Amino acid sequence: MPSFFPLFSSYIYHLVNDAWALTYTTVAVLQDFADDGVVYLELRTTPRSIQASSGNITKFDYVQIILDAIKQFEAQDERLQTRLILSIDRRNSLPEALEVVELCKQFQSQGVVGIDLCGDPMKAGIEALSPAFKAAKKISGLGVTLHFAEAPCSGTDEELKLLLSWEPDRIGHVIHLSSEIRQAIVDRGRIGLELCLSCNVHAKMISGGFEAHHFGSWWNNRHKGCPLVLCVS
């Protein structure tokens, strides 16, 4: 896992670095999901500004380019309907996080359906982002999803209680939980669990293979009211 997050800053961001690359990669991802028979997809991305030789891209432009690519794809293939979730990175400052909230509001009518907390779980200090997620909860129809307990360092009761206080509609990964937090999730009622089996196994975020994944435990207790969603990273 420590080698995973640097891939974005060291490689991926340097490859997807202009409008053409953004459009190309978005359409390629959509095609892969359509070919797999997916009919409804939610993509997530962290808005970023890009300095490119072909022209600088603002965070607003970044989101618009991706939404335009989605619209372009859906015009050619009606099998797949796609919506967008904008992510706040744990490394973001509060002003940067509030900018993402504002982008969600601006693009909600074009297909942005949610806001996410993502990024390197080793980055502490996320309590500074609380005002951004409280602002997001005030936007009617906007869902809130959070990367949750994906690593031991981000699985402390203190952090997880903070995240639950943001009133998320869904939480992702949900690996490193105390029994107290697990019960708190159940007590919340109808909070969606976004479980990423392939990511958790191949990135060695859990011990054991697919048969050891905590999906089975939650599935066997699905009568307790937590909807399960299978996701890919």
Predicted regions, residues:
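Short HxH-centered metal-ligating active-site micro-motif
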Residues: 147
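Metal-cofactor-binding active-site regions of metalloenzymes
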Residues: 1-142, 150-170, 175-191, 197-233
